[in-house]
């Protein structure tokens, strides 16, 4: 355990194109091996495709997608007397946003479209419509929490 306490959160700069911190976080999640300009090209291309398909502001579409993917509950392992229980706990708002972005990017990488721009755009559009693998992941997480509701009194 560190004696100094948790490391302070560094402030996120707003995205230069859309002026949104969410887009900055999405770029950082898409980022691989330090290639930030490539990650920005992918995210901006995906948001442009989303704008072309919906005709609305892509940041609003992204926010709607994130609202459909953000988990409210998750299960965490807790060891009690030799047995490990899956204890349902509420998810903090910053963690739920991080999880939602991680799931969006992760499941867009598994899609079958040809380019990453198409995959990310279609996953964002599916999530904003309540479809897609990332929304299913959220529902599965909530089902796990509901199934283990009996262990909620072990919450810490």
UniProtKB/Swiss-Prot annotation:
InterPro entries in alphabetical order: Ribosomal_uS7 (IPR000235), Ribosomal_uS7_bac/org-type (IPR005717), Ribosomal_uS7_CS (IPR020606), Ribosomal_uS7_dom (IPR023798), Ribosomal_uS7_dom_sf (IPR036823)
GO terms of biological process kind: translation
One GO MF term attached to the UniProt entry: rRNA binding
Pfam families to which the protein is assigned, alphabetical: Ribosomal_S7
Sorted UniProt keywords: Ribonucleoprotein, Ribosomal protein, RNA-binding, rRNA-binding, tRNA-binding
A single cellular component GO annotation: small ribosomal subunit
Role: One of the primary rRNA binding proteins, it binds directly to 16S rRNA where it nucleates assembly of the head domain of the 30S subunit. Is located at the subunit interface close to the decoding center, probably blocks exit of the E-site tRNA.
Summary of subunit composition and partner proteins: Part of the 30S ribosomal subunit. Contacts proteins S9 and S11.
Family membership: Belongs to the universal ribosomal protein uS7 family.
Protein name: Small ribosomal subunit protein uS7
Source species taxonomy: Bacteria, Bacillati, Actinomycetota, Actinomycetes, Mycobacteriales
């Amino acid at each position: 355990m560190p004696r100094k306490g948790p490391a302070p959160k560094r402030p996120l700069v707003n995205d230069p194109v859309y002026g949104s911190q969410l887009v900055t976080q999405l770029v950082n999640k898409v980022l691989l091996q330090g290639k930030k300009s490539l990650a920005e090209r992918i995210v901006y291309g995906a948001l442009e495709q989303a704008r072309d398909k919906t005709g609305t502001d892509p940041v609003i579409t992204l926010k709607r997608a994130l609202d459909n993917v953000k988990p409210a509950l998750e299960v965490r392992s807790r060891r009690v007397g030799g047995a490990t229980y899956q204890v349902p706990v509420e998810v903090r708002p910053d963690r739920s946003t991080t999880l939602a972005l991680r799931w969006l990017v992760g499941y867009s990488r598994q899609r079958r479209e040809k380019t990453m721009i198409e995959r990310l755009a279609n996953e964002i559009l599916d999530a904003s419509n309540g479809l897609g693998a990332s929304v299913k992941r959220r529902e599965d997480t909530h089902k796990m929490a509901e199934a283990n509701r009996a262990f909620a009194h072990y919450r810490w």
